[in-house]
A protein has these predicted regions:
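Conserved S-adenosyl-L-methionine
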Residues: 247-256
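Helix-to-beta-strand junctions that scaffold the AdoMet/dcAdoMet cofactor pocket
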Residues: 146-147, 181
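A short glycine-rich, Lys/Arg-flanked "PGG" loop and its adjoining helix->strand segment in the class I
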Residues: 158-183
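Conserved N-terminal segment of class I S-adenosyl-L-methionine
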Residues: 2-132, 136-140, 256-261
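Short alpha-helix
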Residues: 226-246
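A short beta-strand submotif of the Rossmann-like class I SAM-dependent methyltransferase core
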Residues: 139-142, 148
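Short, glycine-/aromatic-enriched active-site segment of Class I SAM-dependent methyltransferases
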Residues: 153-160, 215-228
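Conserved class I S-adenosyl-L-methionine
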Residues: 150, 169, 183-211
């Protein structure tokens, strides 16, 4: 494991009080609708989606803090944590937090901005980490993107072949999360929520043959408020129970509908 960056000073907010300035902006909220979509309608969709995402991310942060009780004495790992802004917004300490990601550029930002330790992942089947190395492992909206080697999956147009690749990769990823964690919190969007969260298209996009999915996502990427690659496979509640048999499954709801699934081992 390669830790980088010196420890930063303790933040001003306290655990249990998520910092909205840090966690309240989804990555795509600033996307600009193309000229093919009326600007007013595009802006409305963008604001609505950003608001719902902010609400869910805030409630998720509280659930994480309330159920796992992460502390300054815990070794904490965020798998797929990118630049580290999410945990930086909800945890008041830095020196015991590590961000793991495949992108070295975001790891540099996580280290230099927040003083987090970093682990470079290479996309291989096994994490470069010891068994039960971390007291707490956090992983949000990542496992649905673990569908196989990046240089292979975009060339797969057959639905059954892609599903087989994705199931195997997701099972391995879940096993690695469980292997390195004493306690964990793993969240993923629910397959049957009315709006598919990556494309912001109706959920039936995930039920179409993969060949059609690729074409539609490519088309809407040029004429819609979001651009997304066809690298994801959303999970069901049953699948999450199978992937994390030692966890409690908690359902995040929005407007009464299941929006995300969270596997918690406290």
């Amino acid at each position: 494991m390669a830790g980088t960056g010196a420890n930063s000073q303790r933040g001003q907010h306290t655990a249990g009080t998520p910092d909205m300035a840090m966690i309240g902006s989804p990555r795509w909220a600033a996307a600009t609708p193309s000229a093919g979509l009326p600007a007013r309608f595009g802006n409305f969709l963008r604001r609505t989606a950003a608001r719902s995402s902010t609400d869910c991310r805030t409630r998720r942060a509280r659930l994480f803090l309330d159920r796992l009780h992460p502390s300054a004495t815990d070794e904490i790992l965020d798998v797929g944590g990118g630049k580290g802004g999410y945990l930086a917004g909800i945890l008041p300490y830095r020196g015991n937090v590590t961000i793991a990601d495949v992108d070295p550029a975001v790891l540099t930002i996580a280290a230099e901005t927040y003083g987090f330790g970093t682990v470079q992942l290479d996309g291989s089947a096994r994490f470069p980490l010891a068994d039960k190395q971390y007291d707490v492992v956090f992983c949000s909206s990542v496992i649905e993107h673990i569908t196989g080697p990046r240089d292979v999956i975009f060339g797969i147009a057959d639905s059954a072949e892609f599903a087989a690749s994705a199931r195997a990769a997701q099972a391995n990823f879940a096993g690695e999360l469980r292997r390195v964690a004493k306690r964990y919190f793993v969240q993923t969007p629910y397959k049957y929520f009315p709006i598919e969260p990556h494309s912001f298209l109706p959920f039936f996009i995930v039920l179409l043959p993969r060949r059609w999915q690729i074409r539609l996502l490519d088309f809407f990427g040029r004429h819609w408020i979001k651009t997304v690659q066809a690298d994801f496979r959303l999970l069901t509640i049953r699948e999450m129970r199978t992937l994390f048999p030692d966890a409690e499954i908690v359902l995040e709801r929005y407007c009464g509908l299941v929006k995300s699934i969270v596997a918690i081992k406290a």
